[in-house]
């Protein structure tokens, strides 16, 4: 296959931190002598007690991952305190509100005071090292303060995206046994108010029925909206922050002390609590941010991700601040008040590096070029893509229309579990191909493997595995190490299985082809099909449900549901809409059923297993070759499913 290659622009090549020769040299060193390589690069953060041990990892047996295990440091200290002498007056955080007329600029000195005050409030309310703190906030500066305050005192934060339902919030509270929640009365997004506190109150009631009791709720006042209040449990942040001390010593944290738990969808339905620890994570977040974005002092860097996702953790908060960068946080959406908002912000704040998701790119591409062309965007130097594979058409539009043909696009592949970038171009070292994540980052050893476990060489396609550890790797699933082993290390023994399919071309470039397990990637958000199916069958009208993904021009993947109703229940448009609302209520606003097909029966094997492979083909409108259907118990079911498919506008 021949793809157009975009060479490295001269202006990038001239000033890049990493060129092609350095990439090759460092990569070989990182693979051949990882101990030495990571010993050297572990010095990118400051240590209270230096490490003498670097790498102690095994992907076999009980699976154990430790990096810098005898070192002592603190994440908040590295993200704030160490910059104060030389960068105290530098802008650390630019906040752009949902309202285009609202913004704030916070220096490193001011960030230090905000975080110390926040940390002291937590301590005054009994939060201590090792406690779990749930954060349910929209994109306001206090969300970053909360994360950094937890890191400062050694509390473990669990940030939940402020779009998840009370049921989803409760599940996460119960799983990590969190008794302290930080939220706001309301949030603002896209000109709409989101009732955060109401969702938290409901979640607390659900958690209590499962014997997990939330003792304290800190509430940030974002709007003047009404609020339900529980005396003795709830307290206002603004009432305490004004008379709290502006100094709080950073807790001495062992390198392997937990930093945060972040929940991601699992194929069994129950979300997985991905656990990241202190030092290895920060070293990797800092290093990938610096070299992938070729970050130079003084640049304005904007990652549009929400703090509820790993991208917001690694590349909005921890990575940039560890590198003394100026990071921009945006409260709103790309389409409010109109489709030009992103580009107006780029001009307003003179953004140099812009990192967003293919879903946003496709939506804005669909809105037409006029919204882009009314802005200048001359400050832009680099563009980035994250969350899902970017299709070549969107890549080309991003490059030519947004980047004016001169901004390299950093198409980054990584996961919640990996902590940071795994396959990515480096601006000064990597010629680009539209739609390819290109080459592995330092220390990342990739293998493509077939279904039988054979390693495939050269130009090929198969399942993507990683054969050795890296510092940013998750350590376990919270309270479920056995599930951690089974999920990631049992498919191919001694290897981390990513769950993604991958193609390697003749130039050694990698192309991610999508999930090979039962996880959907909807607008860059991972949703488990089992989780959606469980939500559907919890409705009294639903007997059985199967959920698959299908190609969606904006979201990348859409959610297609096949539903069998209870005896005596007839399909109707009213029920169709009710089921859409029901799933949103159970999981959250990101789980919108795009296609609902009522079916008298689902295709099953003789042992009763639903043949999702066939349903995927039908959902993709690709039913001419359904493959082997000899194991179907009732083959005639297929004809009905094809005749009543809901996706006729899709071309195969």
Curated annotation (Swiss-Prot):
Q: Where does CoA bind?
A: 189-192, 311, 523, 584
First-level EC class: ligase
Cofactor(s) recorded in Swiss-Prot or TrEMBL: Mg(2+)
Posttranslational modification:
Acetylated. Deacetylation by the SIR2-homolog deacetylase activates the enzyme.
Q: Which GO terms describe its biological process?
A: acetyl-CoA biosynthetic process from acetate
Q: Which residues bind ATP?
A: 387-389, 411-416, 500, 515, 526
Residues carrying N6-acetyllysine: 609
Q: What is its EC number?
A: 6.2.1.1
Q: Which reactions appear under catalytic activity for this entry? A: acetate + ATP + CoA = acetyl-CoA + AMP + diphosphate
Cited InterPro entries:
Ac_CoA_lig, ACAS_N, AMP-bd_C, AMP-bd_C_sf, AMP-binding_CS, AMP-dep_synth/lig_dom, ANL_N_sf
Can you supply one Gene Ontology CC term for this chain's record?
A: cytosol
* Positions bound to Mg(2+): 537, 539, 542
Tell me the keywords, alphabetical order.
Acetylation, ATP-binding, Ligase, Magnesium, Metal-binding, Nucleotide-binding
Q: Name one GO molecular function term.
A: AMP binding
TM region(s), chain numbering: none
- Which Pfam families is this protein grouped with? ACAS_N, AMP-binding, AMP-binding_C
* Functional summary from the UniProt entry: Catalyzes the conversion of acetate into acetyl-CoA (AcCoA), an essential intermediate at the junction of anabolic and catabolic pathways. AcsA undergoes a two-step reaction. In the first half reaction, AcsA combines acetate with ATP to form acetyl-adenylate (AcAMP) intermediate. In the second half reaction, it can then transfer the acetyl group from AcAMP to the sulfhydryl group of CoA, forming the product AcCoA.
Q: Which family does it belong to?
A: Belongs to the ATP-dependent AMP-binding enzyme family.
Please give the name of this protein: Acetyl-coenzyme A synthetase
Source species of the chain:
Bartonella henselae (strain ATCC 49882 / DSM 28221 / CCUG 30454 / Houston 1) (Rochalimaea henselae)
């Amino acid at each position: 296959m021949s793809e157009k290659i975009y060479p490295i622009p001269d202006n990038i090549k001239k000033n890049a931190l990493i060129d092609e020769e350095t990439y090759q040299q460092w990569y070989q060193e990182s693979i051949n002598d990882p101990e030495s390589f990571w010993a050297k690069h572990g010095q990118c953060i400051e240590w209270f007690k230096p490490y003498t041990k670097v790498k102690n990892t095994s992907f076999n047996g009980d699976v154990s991952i430790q990096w810098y295990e005898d070192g002592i440091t603190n994440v908040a200290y590295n993200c704030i305190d160490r910059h104060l002498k030389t960068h105290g007056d530098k802008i650390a955080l630019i906040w752009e509100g949902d309202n285009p007329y609202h913004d704030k600029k916070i220096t490193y000195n001011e960030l230090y005071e905000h975080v110390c005050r926040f940390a002291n409030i937590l301590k005054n309310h009994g939060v201590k090292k090792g406690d779990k703190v749930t954060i349910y906030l929209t994109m306001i500066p206090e969300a970053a303060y909360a994360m950094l305050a937890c890191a400062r005192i050694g509390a473990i934060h669990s940030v939940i995206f402020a779009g998840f339902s009370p049921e989803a919030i409760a599940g996460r509270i119960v799983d990590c046994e969190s008794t302290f929640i930080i939220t706001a009365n309301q949030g603002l997004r896209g000109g709409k108010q989101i009732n955060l506190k109401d969702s938290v109150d409901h979640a607390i009631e659900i958690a209590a029925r499962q014997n997990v009791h939330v003792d304290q709720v800190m509430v940030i006042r974002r709007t003047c909206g009404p609020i339900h209040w529980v005396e003795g449990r709830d307290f206002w942040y603004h009432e305490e922050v004004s008379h709290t001390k502006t100094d709080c010593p950073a807790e001495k944290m062992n390198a392997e002390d937990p930093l945060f738990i972040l929940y991601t969808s699992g194929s069994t339905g129950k979300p997985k609590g991905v656990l990241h620890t202190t030092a290895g994570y920060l070293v990797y977040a800092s290093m990938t941010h610096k070299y992938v974005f070729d970050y130079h002092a003084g640049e304005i860097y904007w990652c549009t991700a929400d703090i509820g996702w790993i991208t917001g953790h690694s590349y909005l908060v921890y990575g940039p601040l560890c590198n003394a960068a100026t990071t921009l946080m945006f409260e709103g959406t790309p389409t409010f008040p109109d489709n030009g908002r992103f580009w107006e912000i780029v001009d307003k704040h003179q953004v140099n590096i812009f990192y967003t998701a293919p879903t946003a790119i496709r939506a804005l591409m669909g809105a037409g070029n006029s919204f882009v062309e009314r802005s200048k965007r001359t400050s832009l130097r680099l563009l980035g893509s994250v969350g899902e594979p970017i299709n070549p058409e969107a890549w080309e539009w991003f490059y030519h229309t947004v980047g004016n043909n001169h901004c390299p696009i950093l198409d980054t592949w990584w996961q919640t579990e990996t902590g940071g970038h795994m396959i990515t171009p480096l601006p000064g070292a990597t010629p680009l191909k539209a739609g390819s994540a290109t080459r592995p980052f330092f220390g990342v050893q990739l293998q493509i493997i077939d279904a039988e476990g054979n390693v495939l060489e050269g130009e090929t396609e198969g399942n993507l595995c990683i054969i050795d550890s890296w510092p940013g790797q998750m350590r376990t699933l919270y309270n479920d190490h056995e599930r951690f082993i089974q999920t990631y290390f049992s498919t191919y023994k001694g290897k981390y299985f990513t769950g993604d399919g991958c193609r390697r071309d003749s130039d050694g470039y990698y192309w991610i082809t999508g999930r090979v397990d039962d996880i959907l990637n909807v607008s860059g958000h991972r949703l488990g099909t089992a989780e959606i199916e469980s939500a559907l069958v919890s409705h009294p009208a639903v007997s059985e449900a199967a959920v698959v993904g299908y190609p969606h021009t904006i979201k990348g993947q859409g959610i297609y549901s096949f539903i069998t109703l209870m005896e005596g229940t007839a399909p109707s448009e009213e029920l169709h809409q009710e089921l859409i609302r029901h799933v949103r209520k159970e999981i959250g606003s990101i789980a919108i059923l795009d296609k609902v097909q009522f079916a008298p029966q689902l295709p099953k094997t003789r042992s009763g297993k639903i043949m999702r492979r066939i349903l995927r083909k039908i959902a993709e409108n690709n039913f001419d070759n359904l493959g082997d259907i000899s194991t179907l118990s009732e083959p005639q079911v297929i004809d009905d499913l094809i005749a009543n498919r809901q996706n006729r506008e899709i071309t195969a």
